[in-house]
UniProtKB/Swiss-Prot annotation:
A ubiquinone binds at W211. [2Fe-2S] cluster binds at C105, C110, C113, C125. Its main location: mitochondrion. GO terms for biological process: respiratory electron transport chain; tricarboxylic acid cycle. The keyword Transferase does not apply. It comes from Uromyces fabae. [3Fe-4S] cluster binds at C206, C253, C259. [4Fe-4S] cluster binds at C196, C199, C202, C263. This is Succinate dehydrogenase [ubiquinone] iron-sulfur subunit, mitochondrial. Its EC number is 1.3.5.1. It holds the Pfam family Fer4_17.
Length: 283
């Protein structure tokens, strides 16, 4: 779990590059084929909370003089889907159409709904609502990002960094006929990297990225850099390493491992970064 210290939590930057400080602020199922044990397991505990509060970060760029606040909404969980994104959609559709957030696939594939939920960077579509506690769900945008509105971070700089590593196959000697061939063993080397959906949960959980994101590429981009270095079809591995040979782009990683703990896809950016360091040290 990524706990954001009180001294850091209020410091979420707005899209105009000015720091913004937070003010204190039913589905039915058939049981005809179920065993008694299965039926008992499927019953909701009596302690389950039927109504849940969601405290959500709000900031409107059209009202620049108004400080960001936490706004609380109450949701009947019996009339809401199981995920935090379901609650956000319900709030927007039924309670407050001004609430702004990104979402698309609802299946953990696009990365659009990345946000900080109860102190952890994750995807709202994959985060289940905790029904066993009456504590409100606290939802913030990804930390230390410029905010466009409410839960929508400005991803411009993140994508610019991603573009800088040239995330595509580079080879000056294409095959005379057909496609590039790759052995199963070489293909397996890409597992755990190509699945990255660029949600930025890992990068925005990294203290080194918080303080050096103008120069340090961050876990997500560095893992993607290694994805292309490790690809047997790419012939620009040395060139890619050379571009990282400076004091900031790569070496600001201090192996804190927040990136690995928070990745909603279960990937290991820290491992990829360590591979880059090892290869560059042995070159």
């Amino acid at each position: 779990m990524i706990n954001i210290p009180n001294s850091i939590r209020p410091f979420i930057r707005s899209a105009n590059r000015t720091p913004c400080y937070l003010r204190s602020i039913s589905s039915s199922s058939s049981s005809s084929f179920a065993t008694p044990a299965e039926e008992h397991a499927g019953k909701q505990p009596s302690s389950a909370v039927p109504v849940k509060e969601f405290s959500i970060y709000r900031w409107n760029p059209d009202e620049p003089s108004k400080k960001p606040t936490l706004q609380t909404y109450s949701i009947d969980l019996k009339k809401c889907g199981p995920m935090v994104l379901d609650a956000l959609i319900k709030i927007k559709n039924e309670l407050d159409p001004t609430l702004t957030f990104r979402r698309s696939c609802r299946e953990g594939i696009c990365g659009s709904c990345a946000m900080n939920i109860d102190g952890v960077n994750t995807l709202a579509c994959l985060k289940r609502i905790n029904k066993e506690t009456s504590a409100p769900v606290k939802i913030y945008p990804l930390p230390h990002m410029y905010i466009i509105k409410d839960l929508v971070p400005d991803m411009t700089h993140f994508y610019k960094q991603y573009k800088s590593i040239e995330p595509f196959l580079k080879n000056d000697n294409p095959p005379a006929q057909g496609e590039f061939l790759q052995s199963p063993e070489d293909r397996k080397k890409l597992d755990g990297m190509y699945e990255c959906i660029l949600c930025a949960c890992c990068s925005t959980s990294c203290p080194s990225y918080w303080w050096n994101q103008d120069e340090y590429l961050g876990p997500a981009v560095l893992m993607q850099a290694y994805r292309w270095m490790a690809d047997s079809r790419d012939s620009y591995g040395e060139d890619r390493k050379e571009k990282l040979q400076n004091t900031l782009s790569l070496y600001r990683c201090h192996t804190i491992f927040n990136c690995t703990k928070t990745c909603p896809k279960g990937l290991n950016p820290a491992k990829a970064i360590s591979h880059i360091k090892r290869e560059m040290a042995s070159a």
